[in-house]
């Protein structure tokens, strides 16, 4: 049990992020969660009551990330781990799209999938330095291979892989930095507004389970609860203390190619 450990999680209102809140809370962590809007805040409040801290706001806004950290420290006294998990998909957006659509989508995707992680880490860093804490970010099987999205999404997830390596080197020996790379996981992941996908949810795509199953050697599409275990390992001071600069794949073998 990690009763005294305090963790801040972005993208915590749905999908993998929501499952992370549940899993870390069950493991004894104190949790501060950043969600997108009041609807998600109400959902977490209904489930967790006052057991966790909740911030609703734009993950790309640095003041919002600072608020997430400050609320964690104000209530629980310190911060041990920051998890950057917010993200959007591009719904296979191609480079042959009109430039205005492509450029806007690129900016949205990189703002959320990459820049928001830097913002959250920057906000958390002063507190993590006090505790010799750690960072975990959500990468993807698309951090290693093509085919898991369009070029904007794949480029953003390759950037996350580079971020993990660079920051692990920069912040050692006092702060560990790692990532988790899920494969095909059915969630409510939305897309860029510039491409008209901001109201679209991956889980509602016709045939999404069969599509992921066909790409995954283990033969099934994951759900959020199937991919949270590596986050718990990497955040743990005891079990993860000798791990940094590592991205753990949990993709059903998708990175190996089709069977």
Curated annotation (Swiss-Prot):
Keyword entries, A-Z: Aromatic hydrocarbons catabolism, NAD, Oxidoreductase, Plasmid
Active site: 153
Residue numbers binding NAD(+): 8-35, 58, 157
Enzyme class: oxidoreductase
Binding site for substrate: 140
One of the protein's GO biological processes: catabolic process
Cysteines paired by S-S bonds: none
Pfam families: adh_short
InterPro entries in alphabetical order: BphB-like_SDR (IPR047950), NAD(P)-bd_dom_sf (IPR036291), SDR_fam (IPR002347)
Reaction catalyzed: (1R,2S)-1,2-dihydronaphthalene-1,2-diol + NAD(+) = naphthalene-1,2-diol + NADH + H(+)
Protein EC: 1.3.1.29
SUPFAM superfamilies the UniProt entry points to: NAD(P)-binding Rossmann-fold domains (SSF51735)
Pathway(s) annotated for this protein in UniProt: Aromatic compound metabolism; naphthalene degradation
MF terms in GO: cis-1,2-dihydro-1,2-dihydroxynaphthalene dehydrogenase activity; oxidoreductase activity, acting on NAD(P)H, oxygen as acceptor
Similarity comment text for this entry: Belongs to the short-chain dehydrogenases/reductases (SDR) family.
Function: Catalyzes the oxidation of naphthalene dihydrodiol into 1,2-dihydroxynaphthalene.
Protein name from the UniProt record: 1,2-dihydroxy-1,2-dihydronaphthalene dehydrogenase
Record organism: Ralstonia sp
Gene of this entry: nagB
